[in-house]
């Protein structure tokens, strides 16, 4: 049996978990890209001055580094989820979500530092809950030892 994921690719169903995670992860990545693009647009509207780049040079450099890590982990996640479903590809996926969210928070901190701190706390609680629930799922069958 096969299903169609959010990016119109057929994926085999073997329990449904890889498909659910791929759909969830694709939705998170779409939201992250829209948020980062929206914040960049907001920065253009709020400050029409070139001095913003010079006063917040470290923040923009940090944003670029986070986006680079986000892109590398996103590509790695896309390759790993299709090849080998399991814990490591999911943690790589959550890591890419982490860096994409941090990139957005760095841009928000340029506009309002206090608001970005509140968002960071809420976002960290959410990410911790997702990773905790993901890593503590009971397995369907106990691990078997190899034959001696």
Swiss-Prot record:
<comment type="subunit">
    <text>Forms pentamers with a central pore to produce an ion channel.</text>
</comment>
<dbReference type="GO" id="GO:0051259">
    <property type="term" value="P:protein complex oligomerization"/>
</dbReference>
<keyword id="KW-0406">Ion transport</keyword>
<keyword id="KW-0256">Endoplasmic reticulum</keyword>
<dbReference type="GO" id="GO:0005261">
    <property type="term" value="F:monoatomic cation channel activity"/>
</dbReference>
<feature type="transmembrane region" description="Helical; Name=2">
    <location>
        <begin position="52"/>
        <end position="72"/>
    </location>
</feature>
<feature type="transmembrane region" description="Helical; Name=3">
    <location>
        <begin position="91"/>
        <end position="110"/>
    </location>
</feature>
<feature type="transmembrane region" description="Helical; Name=1">
    <location>
        <begin position="26"/>
        <end position="46"/>
    </location>
</feature>
<dbReference type="GO" id="GO:0050832">
    <property type="term" value="P:defense response to fungus"/>
</dbReference>
<protein>
    <recommendedName>
        <fullName>Calcium-permeable cation-selective channel WeiTsing</fullName>
    </recommendedName>
</protein>
<keyword id="KW-0107">Calcium channel</keyword>
<feature type="topological domain" description="Cytoplasmic">
    <location>
        <begin position="1"/>
        <end position="25"/>
    </location>
</feature>
<dbReference type="InterPro" id="IPR053258">
    <property type="entry name" value="Ca-permeable_cation_channel"/>
</dbReference>
<keyword id="KW-0472">Membrane</keyword>
<dbReference type="GO" id="GO:0006812">
    <property type="term" value="P:monoatomic cation transport"/>
</dbReference>
<keyword id="KW-0106">Calcium</keyword>
<keyword id="KW-0813">Transport</keyword>
<comment type="function">
    <text>Calcium-permeable cation-selective channel conferring a broad-spectrum clubroot resistance by supporting cytosolic Ca(2+) increase in root pericycle cells. Triggers immunity toward fungal pathogens such as Plasmodiophora brassicae (Pb) and induces defenses. Also permeable to sodium ion Na(+) and possibly other cations.</text>
</comment>
<dbReference type="GO" id="GO:0042803">
    <property type="term" value="F:protein homodimerization activity"/>
</dbReference>
<dbReference type="GO" id="GO:0005789">
    <property type="term" value="C:endoplasmic reticulum membrane"/>
</dbReference>
<feature type="topological domain" description="Cytoplasmic">
    <location>
        <begin position="134"/>
        <end position="148"/>
    </location>
</feature>
<keyword id="KW-0109">Calcium transport</keyword>
<keyword id="KW-0812">Transmembrane</keyword>
<dbReference type="GO" id="GO:0006814">
    <property type="term" value="P:sodium ion transport"/>
</dbReference>
<dbReference type="GO" id="GO:0009620">
    <property type="term" value="P:response to fungus"/>
</dbReference>
<feature type="transmembrane region" description="Helical; Name=4">
    <location>
        <begin position="117"/>
        <end position="133"/>
    </location>
</feature>
<keyword id="KW-1133">Transmembrane helix</keyword>
<feature type="topological domain" description="Lumenal">
    <location>
        <begin position="47"/>
        <end position="51"/>
    </location>
</feature>
<keyword id="KW-0732">Signal</keyword>
<dbReference type="GO" id="GO:0005262">
    <property type="term" value="F:calcium channel activity"/>
</dbReference>
<dbReference type="GO" id="GO:0006816">
    <property type="term" value="P:calcium ion transport"/>
</dbReference>
<keyword id="KW-0611">Plant defense</keyword>
<feature type="topological domain" description="Cytoplasmic">
    <location>
        <begin position="73"/>
        <end position="90"/>
    </location>
</feature>
<feature type="topological domain" description="Lumenal">
    <location>
        <begin position="111"/>
        <end position="116"/>
    </location>
</feature>
<keyword id="KW-0407">Ion channel</keyword>
<dbReference type="GO" id="GO:0005272">
    <property type="term" value="F:sodium channel activity"/>
</dbReference>
């Amino acid at each position: 049996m096969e299903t169609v994921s959010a990016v119109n690719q057929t994926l085999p169903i073997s329990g449904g978990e890889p498909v659910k995670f791929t759909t969830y992860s694709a939705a998170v990545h779409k939201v992250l890209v829209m948020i980062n693009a929206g914040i960049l647009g907001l920065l253009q509207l709020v400050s029409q001055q070139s001095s913003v780049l010079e006063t917040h040079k470290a923040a923009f450099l940090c944003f670029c580094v986070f986006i680079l890590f986000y892109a590398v982990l996103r590509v790695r996640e896309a390759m790993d989820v299709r090849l080998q479903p399991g814990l490591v590809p999911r943690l790589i996926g959550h890591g890419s979500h982490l860096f994409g969210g941090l990139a957005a928070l760095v841009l928000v901190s340029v506009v309002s530092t206090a608001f970005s701190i509140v968002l960071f706390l809420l976002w960290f609680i959410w990410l911790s809950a997702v990773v905790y629930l993901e890593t503590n799922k009971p397995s369907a069958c106990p691990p078997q030892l190899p034959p001696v």
